[in-house]
Amino acid sequence: MPMINLLLLILPTLIAMAFLMLTERKILGYTQLRKGPNIVGPYGLLQPFADAMKLFTKEPLKPSTSTTALYIIAPTLALTIALLLWTPLPMPNPLINLNLGLLFILATSSLTVYSILWSGWASNSNYALIGALRAVAQTISYEVTSAIILLSVLLMSGSFNLSTLITTQEHIWLLLPTWPLAMMWFISTLAETNRTPFDLTEGESELVSGFNTEYAAGPFALFFMAEYVNIIMMNALTTMIFLGTTHNAHRPELYTTCFTIKTLLLTSLFLWIRTTYPRFRYDQLMYLLWKNFLPLTLTLLMWYISLSTMIASIPPQT
Protein backbone atom coordinates (compact mmCIF):
# COMPACT_ATOMS: atom_id res chain seq x y z
CA MET A 1 0.00 0.00 0.00
CA PRO A 2 2.73 2.58 0.85
CA MET A 3 4.32 1.76 -2.53
CA ILE A 4 1.05 2.54 -4.36
CA ASN A 5 0.72 5.81 -2.41
CA LEU A 6 4.27 6.76 -3.37
CA LEU A 7 3.61 6.02 -7.05
CA LEU A 8 0.36 8.02 -6.92
CA LEU A 9 2.40 10.99 -5.67
CA ILE A 10 5.40 10.66 -8.01
CA LEU A 11 3.67 9.88 -11.33
CA PRO A 12 1.21 12.85 -11.35
CA THR A 13 4.09 15.13 -10.25
CA LEU A 14 6.24 13.99 -13.18
CA ILE A 15 3.32 14.33 -15.63
CA ALA A 16 2.59 17.85 -14.30
CA MET A 17 6.29 18.69 -14.72
CA ALA A 18 6.25 17.47 -18.34
CA PHE A 19 3.25 19.63 -19.23
CA LEU A 20 4.73 22.61 -17.35
CA MET A 21 7.71 22.48 -19.74
CA LEU A 22 5.31 22.45 -22.70
CA THR A 23 3.24 25.31 -21.21
CA GLU A 24 6.38 27.39 -20.72
CA ARG A 25 7.44 26.87 -24.34
CA LYS A 26 3.93 27.77 -25.54
CA ILE A 27 3.80 30.94 -23.39
CA LEU A 28 7.29 31.97 -24.55
CA GLY A 29 6.17 31.34 -28.13
CA TYR A 30 3.01 33.43 -27.92
CA THR A 31 4.78 36.32 -26.15
CA GLN A 32 7.29 36.34 -29.05
CA LEU A 33 4.45 36.21 -31.64
CA ARG A 34 5.05 32.60 -32.72
CA LYS A 35 3.27 29.29 -32.14
CA GLY A 36 5.63 27.21 -30.02
CA PRO A 37 5.69 23.39 -30.35
CA ASN A 38 2.65 22.22 -32.38
CA ILE A 39 3.81 19.24 -34.48
CA VAL A 40 4.08 16.21 -32.15
CA GLY A 41 0.57 15.01 -31.29
CA PRO A 42 -2.58 17.18 -31.29
CA TYR A 43 -1.62 20.84 -30.62
CA GLY A 44 1.90 19.64 -29.71
CA LEU A 45 0.69 17.91 -26.52
CA LEU A 46 3.08 14.96 -26.92
CA GLN A 47 6.15 17.20 -27.30
CA PRO A 48 7.49 16.67 -23.72
CA PHE A 49 7.29 12.88 -24.12
CA ALA A 50 9.10 13.09 -27.49
CA ASP A 51 11.82 15.22 -25.84
CA ALA A 52 12.16 12.73 -22.97
CA MET A 53 12.42 9.80 -25.41
CA LYS A 54 15.08 11.61 -27.43
CA LEU A 55 17.17 12.60 -24.40
CA PHE A 56 17.02 9.25 -22.59
CA THR A 57 17.89 7.23 -25.73
CA LYS A 58 20.96 9.35 -26.58
CA GLU A 59 24.43 8.34 -25.44
CA PRO A 60 25.25 10.09 -22.13
CA LEU A 61 28.62 11.60 -23.09
CA LYS A 62 30.89 12.90 -20.34
CA PRO A 63 34.21 14.75 -20.31
CA SER A 64 37.23 12.41 -20.13
CA THR A 65 38.65 14.41 -17.19
CA SER A 66 35.43 14.40 -15.12
CA THR A 67 34.94 12.66 -11.76
CA THR A 68 32.61 9.88 -12.90
CA ALA A 69 30.86 8.94 -9.62
CA LEU A 70 29.90 12.50 -8.61
CA TYR A 71 29.12 13.40 -12.22
CA ILE A 72 26.42 10.69 -12.33
CA ILE A 73 25.20 11.04 -8.71
CA ALA A 74 24.58 14.84 -8.91
CA PRO A 75 21.60 14.88 -11.36
CA THR A 76 20.05 11.79 -9.71
CA LEU A 77 20.30 13.45 -6.29
CA ALA A 78 18.73 16.67 -7.65
CA LEU A 79 15.59 14.87 -8.89
CA THR A 80 15.37 12.61 -5.80
CA ILE A 81 15.40 15.63 -3.46
CA ALA A 82 12.87 17.49 -5.64
CA LEU A 83 10.44 14.53 -5.38
CA LEU A 84 11.18 13.93 -1.67
CA LEU A 85 10.01 17.47 -0.84
CA TRP A 86 6.44 16.52 -1.81
CA THR A 87 6.01 13.88 0.92
CA PRO A 88 4.95 16.16 3.86
CA LEU A 89 2.63 18.42 1.78
CA PRO A 90 -1.04 18.02 2.84
CA MET A 91 -3.28 17.76 -0.27
CA PRO A 92 -5.41 17.56 2.00
CA ASN A 93 -3.64 14.52 3.54
CA PRO A 94 0.16 14.20 3.39
CA LEU A 95 2.03 11.04 2.40
CA ILE A 96 4.04 11.34 5.65
CA ASN A 97 2.49 13.43 8.43
CA LEU A 98 5.50 15.11 10.04
CA ASN A 99 5.24 17.32 13.12
CA LEU A 100 8.14 19.37 11.77
CA GLY A 101 6.98 19.41 8.13
CA LEU A 102 8.12 22.96 7.36
CA LEU A 103 11.51 22.36 8.97
CA PHE A 104 11.89 19.16 6.90
CA ILE A 105 11.16 21.08 3.67
CA LEU A 106 13.59 23.86 4.60
CA ALA A 107 16.38 21.39 5.48
CA THR A 108 15.83 19.08 2.49
CA SER A 109 15.62 21.90 -0.05
CA SER A 110 19.05 23.06 1.18
CA LEU A 111 20.52 19.72 0.03
CA THR A 112 19.87 20.70 -3.60
CA VAL A 113 22.95 22.92 -3.26
CA TYR A 114 25.14 19.80 -3.02
CA SER A 115 23.91 18.36 -6.32
CA ILE A 116 24.64 21.67 -8.10
CA LEU A 117 28.08 22.03 -6.46
CA TRP A 118 29.04 18.42 -7.24
CA SER A 119 27.90 18.72 -10.85
CA GLY A 120 29.99 21.87 -11.35
CA TRP A 121 33.08 20.45 -9.65
CA ALA A 122 32.85 16.94 -11.16
CA SER A 123 32.51 18.33 -14.71
CA ASN A 124 36.08 19.68 -14.45
CA SER A 125 35.10 22.77 -16.44
CA ASN A 126 35.68 26.39 -15.44
CA TYR A 127 32.28 27.54 -16.72
CA ALA A 128 30.45 24.79 -14.83
CA LEU A 129 32.37 25.49 -11.61
CA ILE A 130 31.68 29.25 -11.71
CA GLY A 131 27.99 28.54 -12.37
CA ALA A 132 27.89 26.08 -9.46
CA LEU A 133 29.57 28.54 -7.06
CA ARG A 134 27.10 31.25 -8.06
CA ALA A 135 24.19 28.87 -7.48
CA VAL A 136 25.49 27.89 -4.03
CA ALA A 137 25.99 31.51 -2.91
CA GLN A 138 22.57 32.52 -4.26
CA THR A 139 20.65 29.59 -2.76
CA ILE A 140 22.27 29.82 0.67
CA SER A 141 21.72 33.61 0.77
CA TYR A 142 18.03 33.45 -0.12
CA GLU A 143 17.39 30.59 2.30
CA VAL A 144 18.26 32.97 5.14
CA THR A 145 15.28 35.21 4.34
CA SER A 146 13.06 32.20 3.53
CA ALA A 147 13.74 30.76 7.01
CA ILE A 148 12.95 34.09 8.73
CA ILE A 149 9.71 34.48 6.72
CA LEU A 150 8.67 30.93 7.64
CA LEU A 151 9.45 31.65 11.30
CA SER A 152 7.18 34.72 11.20
CA VAL A 153 4.36 32.61 9.70
CA LEU A 154 4.91 29.88 12.31
CA LEU A 155 4.42 32.42 15.10
CA MET A 156 0.90 33.01 13.76
CA SER A 157 0.23 29.36 12.99
CA GLY A 158 1.64 28.01 16.27
CA SER A 159 3.07 24.80 14.76
CA PHE A 160 5.66 23.46 12.32
CA ASN A 161 3.01 21.05 11.03
CA LEU A 162 1.74 22.03 7.57
CA SER A 163 -1.75 20.70 8.33
CA THR A 164 -2.07 23.34 11.09
CA LEU A 165 -1.81 26.05 8.43
CA ILE A 166 -5.12 24.82 6.96
CA THR A 167 -6.82 25.37 10.34
CA THR A 168 -5.09 28.75 10.83
CA GLN A 169 -6.49 30.06 7.53
CA GLU A 170 -10.09 28.94 7.96
CA HIS A 171 -11.33 32.54 8.24
CA ILE A 172 -8.67 34.64 6.49
CA TRP A 173 -5.70 33.99 4.20
CA LEU A 174 -2.34 34.75 5.82
CA LEU A 175 -1.55 36.69 2.62
CA LEU A 176 -3.67 39.63 3.87
CA PRO A 177 -2.07 40.33 7.29
CA THR A 178 1.43 39.39 6.07
CA TRP A 179 1.51 40.67 2.48
CA PRO A 180 5.06 42.17 2.70
CA LEU A 181 6.34 38.75 3.80
CA ALA A 182 4.37 37.06 1.01
CA MET A 183 5.93 39.34 -1.63
CA MET A 184 9.45 38.70 -0.31
CA TRP A 185 8.75 34.95 -0.03
CA PHE A 186 7.61 34.81 -3.67
CA ILE A 187 10.76 36.62 -4.86
CA SER A 188 12.89 34.31 -2.67
CA THR A 189 11.26 31.24 -4.27
CA LEU A 190 12.17 32.65 -7.69
CA ALA A 191 15.78 32.99 -6.53
CA GLU A 192 15.89 29.55 -4.89
CA THR A 193 14.63 27.81 -8.03
CA ASN A 194 17.17 29.77 -10.14
CA ARG A 195 14.48 31.29 -12.35
CA THR A 196 14.50 34.54 -14.33
CA PRO A 197 15.41 37.26 -13.28
CA PHE A 198 17.69 35.32 -10.86
CA ASP A 199 19.05 32.71 -13.32
CA LEU A 200 22.65 33.88 -12.90
CA THR A 201 23.76 30.23 -12.59
CA GLU A 202 23.11 29.63 -16.30
CA GLY A 203 23.99 33.03 -17.73
CA GLU A 204 24.31 32.00 -21.39
CA SER A 205 26.16 35.17 -22.38
CA GLU A 206 28.99 34.55 -19.90
CA LEU A 207 28.88 30.90 -18.71
CA VAL A 208 27.69 28.94 -21.80
CA SER A 209 25.02 27.10 -19.78
CA GLY A 210 26.24 27.29 -16.18
CA PHE A 211 26.66 24.27 -13.92
CA ASN A 212 25.17 21.83 -16.48
CA THR A 213 27.41 22.90 -19.40
CA GLU A 214 29.11 19.48 -19.68
CA TYR A 215 25.91 17.42 -19.29
CA ALA A 216 24.08 15.74 -22.16
CA ALA A 217 21.24 13.24 -22.74
CA GLY A 218 19.69 11.58 -19.63
CA PRO A 219 21.67 13.33 -16.84
CA PHE A 220 20.91 16.73 -18.42
CA ALA A 221 17.20 15.82 -18.56
CA LEU A 222 17.27 14.90 -14.84
CA PHE A 223 18.53 18.40 -13.93
CA PHE A 224 15.84 19.93 -16.11
CA MET A 225 13.14 17.77 -14.51
CA ALA A 226 14.36 18.63 -10.98
CA GLU A 227 14.10 22.37 -11.76
CA TYR A 228 10.49 22.14 -12.92
CA VAL A 229 9.41 19.80 -10.10
CA ASN A 230 10.90 22.35 -7.67
CA ILE A 231 8.94 25.17 -9.31
CA ILE A 232 5.62 23.35 -8.82
CA MET A 233 6.60 22.35 -5.26
CA MET A 234 7.54 25.90 -4.24
CA ASN A 235 4.26 27.27 -5.61
CA ALA A 236 2.32 24.51 -3.80
CA LEU A 237 4.10 25.51 -0.58
CA THR A 238 3.30 29.21 -1.20
CA THR A 239 -0.37 28.26 -1.66
CA MET A 240 -0.37 26.37 1.65
CA ILE A 241 1.38 29.11 3.62
CA PHE A 242 -0.33 32.24 2.29
CA LEU A 243 -3.42 31.16 0.30
CA GLY A 244 -4.76 28.38 2.53
CA THR A 245 -7.87 26.52 1.42
CA THR A 246 -10.52 25.48 3.97
CA HIS A 247 -10.66 21.71 4.28
CA ASN A 248 -14.14 20.18 4.51
CA ALA A 249 -13.75 16.59 5.76
CA HIS A 250 -16.96 15.55 3.98
CA ARG A 251 -15.82 16.94 0.60
CA PRO A 252 -12.00 16.65 0.43
CA GLU A 253 -12.06 16.98 -3.38
CA LEU A 254 -12.96 20.70 -2.98
CA TYR A 255 -9.69 21.32 -1.13
CA THR A 256 -7.67 19.51 -3.82
CA THR A 257 -9.40 21.43 -6.64
CA CYS A 258 -8.89 24.88 -5.05
CA PHE A 259 -5.32 24.00 -4.08
CA THR A 260 -4.48 22.89 -7.64
CA ILE A 261 -6.01 26.01 -9.24
CA LYS A 262 -4.06 28.36 -6.93
CA THR A 263 -0.80 26.46 -7.50
CA LEU A 264 -1.27 26.55 -11.28
CA LEU A 265 -1.97 30.31 -11.22
CA LEU A 266 1.21 30.96 -9.21
CA THR A 267 3.19 28.71 -11.58
CA SER A 268 1.82 30.68 -14.55
CA LEU A 269 3.08 33.84 -12.83
CA PHE A 270 6.58 32.25 -12.70
CA LEU A 271 6.41 31.68 -16.47
CA TRP A 272 5.05 35.17 -17.12
CA ILE A 273 7.94 36.69 -15.14
CA ARG A 274 10.37 34.75 -17.34
CA THR A 275 8.90 36.25 -20.51
CA THR A 276 8.89 39.80 -19.08
CA TYR A 277 12.01 40.56 -17.02
CA PRO A 278 15.70 40.66 -17.96
CA ARG A 279 18.41 39.05 -15.84
CA PHE A 280 19.85 40.92 -12.83
CA ARG A 281 23.54 41.58 -12.38
CA TYR A 282 25.05 39.36 -9.69
CA ASP A 283 25.88 42.25 -7.35
CA GLN A 284 22.29 43.56 -7.64
CA LEU A 285 20.96 40.13 -6.71
CA MET A 286 23.08 39.96 -3.54
CA TYR A 287 22.42 43.61 -2.68
CA LEU A 288 18.66 42.98 -2.89
CA LEU A 289 18.95 40.19 -0.34
CA TRP A 290 21.49 41.39 2.23
CA LYS A 291 20.67 45.13 2.14
CA ASN A 292 16.90 45.05 1.56
CA PHE A 293 15.24 41.71 2.35
CA LEU A 294 17.22 40.73 5.45
CA PRO A 295 16.64 43.96 7.48
CA LEU A 296 12.97 44.02 6.40
CA THR A 297 12.27 40.40 7.35
CA LEU A 298 14.03 40.77 10.71
CA THR A 299 12.03 43.92 11.49
CA LEU A 300 8.76 42.20 10.54
CA LEU A 301 9.71 39.14 12.60
CA MET A 302 10.16 41.35 15.69
CA TRP A 303 6.84 43.06 14.91
CA TYR A 304 4.93 39.75 14.72
CA ILE A 305 6.59 38.50 17.94
CA SER A 306 5.69 41.69 19.83
CA LEU A 307 2.17 41.78 18.33
CA SER A 308 1.30 38.25 19.49
CA THR A 309 2.80 38.98 22.94
CA MET A 310 0.82 42.24 23.24
CA ILE A 311 -2.47 40.63 22.23
CA ALA A 312 -1.91 37.68 24.57
CA SER A 313 -1.10 39.90 27.57
CA ILE A 314 -4.08 42.29 27.31
CA PRO A 315 -6.16 41.80 30.50
CA PRO A 316 -9.59 40.22 29.96
CA GLN A 317 -12.35 42.78 29.36
CA THR A 318 -15.45 42.49 31.58
Curated annotation (Swiss-Prot):
Its EC number is 7.1.1.2. PROSITE patterns: COMPLEX1_ND1_1, COMPLEX1_ND1_2. It is a multi-pass membrane protein. One of its GO terms (cellular component) is mitochondrial inner membrane. The chain crosses the membrane at residues 2-22, 69-89, 100-120, 147-167, 171-191, 222-242, 253-273, 294-314. Keywords: Electron transport, Membrane, Mitochondrion, Mitochondrion inner membrane, NAD, Respiratory chain, Translocase, Transmembrane, Transmembrane helix, Transport, Ubiquinone. One of its GO terms (biological process) is mitochondrial respiratory chain complex I assembly. InterPro entries: NADH_UbQ_OxRdtase_su1/FPO (IPR001694), NADH_UbQ_OxRdtase_su1_CS (IPR018086). It is found in: Mitochondrion inner membrane. It comes from the Eukaryota. Its main location: mitochondrion. It catalyses: a ubiquinone + NADH + 5 H(+)(in) = a ubiquinol + NAD(+) + 4 H(+)(out). One of its GO terms (molecular function) is NADH dehydrogenase (ubiquinone) activity. The keyword tRNA-binding does not apply. Belongs to the complex I subunit 1 family. Core subunit of the mitochondrial membrane respiratory chain NADH dehydrogenase (Complex I) which catalyzes electron transfer from NADH through the respiratory chain, using ubiquinone as an electron acceptor. Essential for the catalytic activity and assembly of complex I. PANTHER family: NADH DEHYDROGENASE SUBUNIT 1, NADH-UBIQUINONE OXIDOREDUCTASE CHAIN 1. Core subunit of respiratory chain NADH dehydrogenase (Complex I) which is composed of 45 different subunits. This is NADH-ubiquinone oxidoreductase chain 1. The gene is MT-ND1.
